[in-house]
Amino acid sequence: MKYNIVLKFEVEGIVDKPDVIGAIFGQTENLFGEEFDLRELQDKGRLGRIYVNINTSKNKTEGEIIIPSNLDRIETALIAAMVENVDKVGPYNARFKLVEIQDIREEKIKKIIDRAKEILGTWTKEKTLDIKEVIYEISSAVKTGEIIEYGPDRLPAGPDVDKDPELIIVEGRADVINLLRYGYKNVIAIEGATGKIPQTIIDLAKQKKTVIAFLDGDHGGDLILKELLANNVKIDYVARAPTGKEVEELTGKEINKSLANMMTVAQYMKKQQEAQQALKEALAPESQPPIVVSKPTTPEQIKEITIKIPQHIIEEIKKLPGTLEGIMFDENWNPIERIQVRDIVQRLENLTDNQNISYIIFDGVITQRLLDLASAKNIKLLVGARIGGISKRPKNVEILTMTDLFTS
């Protein structure tokens, strides 16, 4: 059925349902010919069964009639008007009034839409794609699915460590996992070797065309390289993580850059020896003449800076490279404080006038912010590992790199 014709009625007497239905059929018969005879329409399935609800009180009968219709809109409206025209039920006067014509299809559509919303809500809640979960699942698959235990020493390694002609040696399991995450499957860890490198590493390296030692950018990385070389492991190239960083925390971009900048063992050792030699030659004993560094401040003027470094200070400076630390001195080169490089700016911000700091030597970058703070706090000299982008140099602060200091 398409529609429900809903009517209210009132009869001025006590009647039953058959009386009401009989009045409807009797008073609408042949009004518009057999084509719109209600019984004929019911027989053809064009109208449904007539439902009557009755309430009687005080010699009156009231109620509601529902007539299901499968006719079109115009024909359904005509049937409603015909029933409204009924004015007697039995011997009693009666009034029939149309309440509404319900579109059953609209109700069905509304129910379908509401149900669809309910289904979608449940489905969305259960099936929503969470990118973090996807990444975690993929990462977990890399960790558990690709990492293997290689050789008699059961060392953490990538799945291609045996068949790839190139081998990357790292320190620990976490380093292997990180390289696997970025697609490097020819990697193996020595797993924290101290003094003795596993025989598995020595034997595997001999079979490879190229062997790369990829190590942390700290003192620990230096020690691992020494152990590898001391145990006669075949190493062709050395790659290092950025200073102060570990291989396990590098991004894919940082890994690519570190490997692109790798050096042969000979080149690497030569560079290290040159740096050590420069340090030894530059840091002379107390009896040597004062170090004189000339730096041009303008094209027309060269200002000479004379710095005399006591022997005990020289010994301290020798230990700074690679520590990411700094030392603050007073005007007489008495050490006031040893500090992490990352804390120097905050320390200067909190510096009071009665704290007599004149010189700062540190294993870090001299930045514009640090230079401005040093000027405001009347620091006379900053010596860093290198100088960053400086656009303005205060007149009351001199800046040098350790290279300047060592090669003067």
UniProtKB/Swiss-Prot annotation:
GO molecular function: DNA-directed RNA polymerase activity; metal ion binding; poly(A) binding
EC number: 2.7.7.101
Keyword Transcription: yes
Subunit-level organization: Forms a ternary complex with MCM helicase and DNA. Component of the archaeal exosome complex.
Binding site for Mg(2+) 2: 216, 218
Alphabetical list of InterPro entries matching this protein: DnaG_primase, Primase_DnaG_arc, TOPRIM_DnaG/twinkle, TOPRIM_dom
Pfam family for this entry, one: Toprim_4
Cofactor info, note text: Binds two Mg(2+) per subunit.
Cofactor(s), names only, from the UniProt record: Mg(2+)
Disulfide pairings: none
UniProt-recorded name of the protein: DNA primase DnaG
PANTHER family assigned: DNA PRIMASE (PTHR30313:SF2)
Catalytic reaction list: ssDNA + n NTP = ssDNA/pppN(pN)n-1 hybrid + (n-1) diphosphate
Naturally occurring in which organism (per UniProt): Sulfurisphaera tokodaii (strain DSM 16993 / JCM 10545 / NBRC 100140 / 7) (Sulfolobus tokodaii)
Family (UniProt): Belongs to the archaeal DnaG primase family.
Gene3D superfamilies according to UniProt: 3.40.1360.10
Keyword annotations of the record: DNA replication, DNA-directed RNA polymerase, Exosome, Magnesium, Metal-binding, Nucleotidyltransferase, Primosome, Transcription, Transferase
Record-linked HAMAP family: DNA_primase_DnaG_arc
Positions annotated to bind Mg(2+) 1: 171, 216
Role played: RNA polymerase that catalyzes the synthesis of short RNA molecules used as primers for DNA polymerase during DNA replication. Also part of the exosome, which is a complex involved in RNA degradation. Acts as a poly(A)-binding protein that enhances the interaction between heteromeric, adenine-rich transcripts and the exosome.
Cellular component GO terms held in the UniProt record: cytoplasm; DNA-directed RNA polymerase complex; exosome (RNase complex); primosome complex
GO annotation (BP), single: DNA replication, synthesis of primer
Domain Toprim positions: 165-243
Superkingdom, taxonomy of origin: Archaea
